[in-house]
């Protein structure tokens, strides 16, 4: 069996990290197994779906490096859904219902007030032809429900283990709206059968939906003479750092927002691939590495929490491992046309975001007001500063001479030099940064002048 999985977002908002977990888990599963990855837009919610959100989803996937083998758009497949509906009607598995949304809400409220589950009472099945004709004469148009067969619905979930539902505890799902358009529960199953999806890996908020869809898969396979029931896996949903739920409309956790904040795609994928698993969370330098290490069996059942600080740590790890050639064009996009390998190697260990390189470029090349605490110390350091050209040994020789002249050592030696040369208490190693600053600028700063 060739593994086939899918990522099927609705273009009704920006992708967030919860969506990323679904996309990445499916992508890694497919690549590890040598299978195929389908990117499908579930865009039948025409009121809320927009081309802008569809384009943003594609942009996010490309930014992450999650390529796809096949693409589908549900709005292109209405004719296929009509055929599936006709087959289910012929099989007697769909029935028309005429309750309004208000009437259904009243039924639901009444059941809940009695402490009973809000399961649809199948009142529509008791309507006769005359009743239906009368309701339609009043202007009502039916929505169509899928009739669940009585009995136990079971599957072996790759993450949750054995799952079991009684059909009597579930409402017959609405598959067709009053205007004739199909709903997700139907379109998703039809697509999964047509594209021969072997594994459906998604969030645990779909578990009850899966129970319904298992019967729908079976009914369609019977009615159309093809297809079967895929293997299911339901992973826990991600919470925020404080345990709060996430939404794709929560802007701070959207992939676009994270990208704009300077998050590296490999850092994000490394974090999300390991979050909630038994693996240590460390950065990987390629998606191929993540795929080779991926194992669905390592995914736990507890609720993982998304920690921005942990992501920042991995972001730094990814940047610190990048050669200059990998970031050269991105540095140019930041306006650092003169950046070279020496600059990158000097500042790389101190970056948590690539944009931080701009700050250190300005330290090395732009006017800066130094911080001088002891003018005599700074004057001695300036007097002892060697002539250029400078090499790797220049910093050590210079600081040794300053130490001998002033008696300063340790922090009392190095911090005043750093403040004078960079106006900062922390930063890249000065033995690599000093040659970038240059002797002329260094002398001016040691004398207290802006340079």
UniProtKB/Swiss-Prot annotation:
Top-rank taxon, per record: Bacteria
Catalytic activity, reaction form: tRNA(Glu) + L-glutamate + ATP = L-glutamyl-tRNA(Glu) + AMP + diphosphate
Pfam families, alphabetized: Anticodon_2, tRNA-synt_1c
Motif ('KMSKS' region): 245-249
Subcellular location field: Cytoplasm
Motif 'HIGH' region location, chain numbering: 9-19
GO CC terms: cytoplasm
Keywords annotated in UniProt: Aminoacyl-tRNA synthetase, ATP-binding, Cytoplasm, Ligase, Nucleotide-binding, Protein biosynthesis
Keyword ATP-binding: yes
Transmembrane segments: none
One annotated GO biological process: glutamyl-tRNA aminoacylation
GO MF annotations, alphabetized: ATP binding; glutamate-tRNA ligase activity; tRNA binding; zinc ion binding
EC number: 6.1.1.17
InterPro entries: aa-tRNA-synth_I_cd-bd, aa-tRNA-synth_I_codon-bd_sub2, aa-tRNA-synth_I_CS, aa_tRNA-synth_I_cd-bd_sf, Glu-tRNA-ligase_bac/mito, Glu/Gln-tRNA-synth, Glu/Gln-tRNA-synth_Ib_cat-dom, GluQ/Sye
Major subcellular location class: cytoplasm
Residues involved in ATP binding: 248
Function: Catalyzes the attachment of glutamate to tRNA(Glu) in a two-step reaction: glutamate is first activated by ATP to form Glu-AMP and then transferred to the acceptor end of tRNA(Glu).
Protein family membership: Belongs to the class-I aminoacyl-tRNA synthetase family. Glutamate--tRNA ligase type 1 subfamily.
Subunit (UniProt): Monomer.
Protein name, per record: Glutamate--tRNA ligase 1
Organism of origin: Rhodospirillum centenum (strain ATCC 51521 / SW)
Lineage: Bacteria, Pseudomonadati, Pseudomonadota, Alphaproteobacteria, Rhodospirillales
